[in-house]
């Protein structure tokens, strides 16, 4: 997690995970959630919390990055950057074959690592339906923010703006 909007800002929290795929998904999601800015308000007699990213969108983004990354790129790793205005999930490699950003948004699927997808399906992390990216966009649109997918050099980046309490 960074103190501002750039990687040149102060690092507030940094973790390097070397566990199993499933434990890394869980640990990444927990670490991000601990560092997210949470808004609170009183509604009636109850306190209500507003999270800037839904749990489903976060988990799906992390799972996609780990399962669909290009493991042939030596020395590269999935990187998660939490800034004050957005979360960036950076996955090594460009999309495989003829997959484009637009095709990802509508759920076209090509599994770069089918064995990993099978394992994660058996562990109930994925459904193999190609609906992860459309679900992330739907979840975040429900909070009135628009995620972005972009390709930079040899990385696929999912950028999710942090929602504010009133959109």
Where does each model-flagged region fall?
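Conserved beta-strand-loop-beta-strand hairpin that lines the nucleotide-binding pocket
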Residues: 1-26, 53-166
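Helix-hairpin-helix/helix-loop-helix acidic hairpins
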Residues: 4, 17-50
């Amino acid at each position: 997690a960074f103190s501002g909007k750039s990687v040149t800002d102060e690092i507030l929290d940094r973790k390097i995970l070397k566990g199993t795929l499933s434990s890394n998904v869980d640990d990444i999601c927990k670490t991000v959630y601990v560092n997210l800015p949470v808004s609170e308000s009183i509604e009636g007699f109850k306190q209500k919390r507003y999270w800037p990213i839904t749990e489903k969108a976060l988990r799906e983004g992390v799972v996609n990055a780990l399962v669909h990354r290009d493991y042939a790129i030596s020395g590269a790793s999935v990187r998660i950057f939490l800034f004050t205005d957005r979360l960036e999930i950076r996955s090594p490699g460009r999309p495989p074959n003829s997959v484009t950003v637009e095709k990802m948004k509508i759920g076209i699927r090509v599994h770069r690592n089918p064995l990993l997808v099978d394992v994660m399906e058996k562990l109930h992390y994925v459904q193999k339906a190609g609906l992860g990216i459309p679900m992330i966009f739907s979840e975040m649109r429900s909070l009135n923010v628009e995620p972005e997918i972009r390709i930079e050099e040899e990385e696929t980046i999912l950028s999710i703006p942090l929602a504010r309490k009133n959109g």
